[in-house]
Protein backbone atom coordinates (compact mmCIF):
# COMPACT_ATOMS: atom_id res chain seq x y z
CA UNK A 1 0.00 0.00 0.00
CA UNK A 2 2.85 2.39 0.84
CA UNK A 3 4.48 1.60 -2.49
CA UNK A 4 1.29 2.42 -4.36
CA UNK A 5 0.91 5.71 -2.49
CA UNK A 6 4.52 6.66 -3.16
CA UNK A 7 4.09 5.83 -6.84
CA UNK A 8 1.00 8.04 -7.06
CA UNK A 9 2.84 10.94 -5.40
CA UNK A 10 5.78 10.64 -7.81
CA UNK A 11 3.49 10.47 -10.85
CA UNK A 12 1.58 13.53 -9.62
CA UNK A 13 4.79 15.53 -9.17
CA UNK A 14 6.06 14.59 -12.62
CA UNK A 15 2.74 15.45 -14.28
CA UNK A 16 2.31 18.79 -12.51
CA UNK A 17 5.87 19.90 -13.27
CA UNK A 18 5.43 22.69 -10.68
CA UNK A 19 4.94 25.44 -13.26
CA UNK A 20 8.25 25.15 -15.08
CA UNK A 21 6.46 25.05 -18.42
CA UNK A 22 4.00 27.50 -19.89
CA UNK A 23 1.64 27.75 -22.83
CA UNK A 24 2.56 30.21 -25.59
CA UNK A 25 0.86 31.09 -28.84
CA UNK A 26 3.00 30.12 -31.83
CA UNK A 27 0.96 31.08 -34.90
CA UNK A 28 2.45 33.48 -37.42
CA UNK A 29 0.75 36.65 -38.71
CA UNK A 30 -2.82 35.93 -39.83
CA UNK A 31 -2.79 32.17 -39.18
CA UNK A 32 -5.46 30.67 -36.86
CA UNK A 33 -4.36 30.67 -33.20
CA UNK A 34 -2.29 27.68 -32.12
CA UNK A 35 -0.40 27.05 -28.89
CA UNK A 36 2.63 25.11 -27.77
CA UNK A 37 4.08 24.12 -24.40
CA UNK A 38 7.33 25.96 -23.70
CA UNK A 39 10.02 25.01 -21.22
CA UNK A 40 11.89 28.32 -21.44
CA UNK A 41 9.50 30.10 -19.05
CA UNK A 42 8.88 32.96 -21.48
CA UNK A 43 6.79 33.74 -24.55
CA UNK A 44 7.41 36.39 -27.17
CA UNK A 45 5.58 38.33 -29.85
CA UNK A 46 7.41 40.43 -32.39
CA UNK A 47 5.91 42.63 -35.08
CA UNK A 48 7.39 44.42 -38.05
CA UNK A 49 6.20 46.03 -41.27
CA UNK A 50 7.24 44.90 -44.73
CA UNK A 51 5.83 45.25 -48.27
CA UNK A 52 2.91 42.95 -47.29
CA UNK A 53 1.96 45.01 -44.23
CA UNK A 54 2.38 44.13 -40.56
CA UNK A 55 3.94 40.72 -39.90
CA UNK A 56 3.73 38.92 -36.54
CA UNK A 57 5.82 36.11 -35.11
CA UNK A 58 5.04 34.36 -31.82
CA UNK A 59 6.78 31.60 -29.92
CA UNK A 60 8.80 30.40 -26.93
CA UNK A 61 11.70 32.20 -25.31
CA UNK A 62 12.77 35.81 -25.81
CA UNK A 63 14.85 36.50 -28.93
CA UNK A 64 17.39 39.28 -29.15
CA UNK A 65 15.82 42.63 -30.05
CA UNK A 66 16.32 43.83 -33.63
CA UNK A 67 15.98 47.49 -34.70
CA UNK A 68 12.59 48.32 -36.26
CA UNK A 69 11.00 45.16 -34.78
CA UNK A 70 8.54 45.58 -31.92
CA UNK A 71 9.39 42.84 -29.40
CA UNK A 72 7.32 41.88 -26.37
CA UNK A 73 8.53 39.13 -24.01
CA UNK A 74 6.26 37.94 -21.20
CA UNK A 75 6.05 35.27 -18.49
CA UNK A 76 2.43 34.12 -18.15
CA UNK A 77 0.37 31.55 -20.08
CA UNK A 78 -0.90 32.83 -23.45
CA UNK A 79 0.50 36.31 -22.79
CA UNK A 80 1.75 36.72 -26.37
CA UNK A 81 -1.68 36.73 -28.03
Curated annotation (Swiss-Prot):
Keywords: Acetylcholine receptor inhibiting toxin, Disulfide bond, Ion channel impairing toxin, Neurotoxin, Postsynaptic neurotoxin, Secreted, Signal, Toxin. It is found in: Secreted. PROSITE patterns: SNAKE_TOXIN. Disulfide bonds join 24-43, 38-60, 62-73, 74-79. Its main location: secreted. Residues 1-21 form the signal peptide. One of its GO terms (molecular function) is acetylcholine receptor inhibitor activity. InterPro entries: Snake_3FTx, Snake_toxin-like_sf, Snake_toxin_con_site, Toxin_cobra-type. It holds the Pfam family Toxin_cobra-type. Gene3D superfamilies: CD59. One of its GO terms (cellular component) is extracellular region. Expressed by the venom gland. This is Three-finger toxin MALT0057C. It comes from Micrurus altirostris (Uruguayan coral snake).
Amino acid sequence: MKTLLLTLVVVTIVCLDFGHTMICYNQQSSQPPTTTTCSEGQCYKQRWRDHRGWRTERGCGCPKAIPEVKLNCCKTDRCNG
